[in-house]
Amino acid sequence: MEKVKVIIMGLGAMGGGMADMLLKKQGVEIVGVVGRGKMLGTSMYDHISTPRGDREDVIVGAMEDVITEKAADVVLLCTDSFTRKAFDKIKFIVEKKINVISSAEEMAYPMAQEPELAKEIDRLAKENGVSVLGTGINPGLIMDLLVILMTGCCEEVHSILSRRVNSLSPFGPAVMEEQGIGITVEEFNKGVQEGTLAGHVGFHESIGMIADAIGWKLSAPITQSMEPIVTDVDRKSPYGFAKAGNVAGCAMKGFGYVDGELKIEMDHPQQIEPEQVGVQTGDYVIINGVPNINMVNSPEVPGGIGTIAMCVNMIPQIINARPGLHTMIDLPVPRAIMGDFRDLISEEAKIVK
């Protein structure tokens, strides 16, 4: 069997990390990279940590030049956070008859906020015989799929609290902007009031995924709250900077109600360089049920590595999947791939033979 052929679209913090990870793996190769601006015409190896060595070069190109019909088995789409912004790119890729894994947060469960676009993506994917998945560390695993997994050992579930205390330091400029890193408290509050500050993108998706997975019908729209985390020391991450007195993070909560009762709560304070101020990161799944569940992982699963690994490790599942739009609750569970990618892929499902 030919190696699994991968195109990466977007070579920022996440896309570049996926390239580095793929280059360490067996049975898979990067056959194209899509970029823009000054990146066009440069070598992929100019933008990632892995040296080229004796590998064949991969030149960054425009979408129309790199993504041609059946040019790869999958495109890792590492741009955008919102389904509506990612839609045209997804449409372009699936119409070239290539599978898609998107790191856009809303794509983890697009039916939560964009049901019509989700139906259209599903239709386009089926029409072209390919599959589409959105995943990442969160949404995609920690605050939703992991929670769902832990309900599997419960006879009854009365309520759920999913908490993630994490560092934003690995993430790129798009996330820094969404979280308001470096702005003043006044600018943050104005952004919240005007709806221009996204904060964490994914509560609707995580709550919707959990509710649908275990059979709860939400009785009211999902709500969320958003508060600034103000730093008293200067903090600098690879892609963000917050001077003392400004915003270094965003504390968000999300709430899902069933029959008027709070059943699913999300608690998600995240900031750059939390260790500078003694904040202990961690992931927590707290289920009030039969039995009670109190799962703790501390420090947190790092968001950057986690998102990179989730997207790369789901490649076999999306290639093998039936055509259409998928989510993490209808595909085989993610797992590390320590052997050859080809061993996990059905030959008839492979696009590049």
From Swiss-Prot:
Origin superkingdom: Bacteria
Family from the record: Belongs to the DapB family.
Protein name: 2,4-diaminopentanoate dehydrogenase
Presence of the UniProt keyword Endoplasmic reticulum in the record: no
Gene: ord
Organism listed in the record: Acetoanaerobium sticklandii (strain ATCC 12662 / DSM 519 / JCM 1433 / CCUG 9281 / NCIMB 10654 / HF) (Clostridium sticklandii)
A biological process term (GO) from this entry: ornithine metabolic process
Listed EC numbers: 1.4.1.12
Disulfide bond residue pairs: none
Protein's UniProt keywords contain Oxidoreductase: yes
Self-association state and partner proteins as the record states: Homodimer.
Function: Involved in the ornithine fermentation pathway. Catalyzes the oxidative deamination of (2R,4S)-2,4-diaminopentanoate (DAP) to yield 2-amino-4-ketopentanoate (AKP).
MF (Gene Ontology): 2,4-diaminopentanoate dehydrogenase activity; nucleotide binding
Catalytic activity: (2R,4S)-2,4-diaminopentanoate + NAD(+) + H2O = (2R)-2-amino-4-oxopentanoate + NH4(+) + NADH + H(+); (2R,4S)-2,4-diaminopentanoate + NADP(+) + H2O = (2R)-2-amino-4-oxopentanoate + NH4(+) + NADPH + H(+)
InterPro entries for the chain: DAP_DH_C, Gfo/Idh/MocA-like_OxRdtase_N, NAD(P)-bd_dom_sf
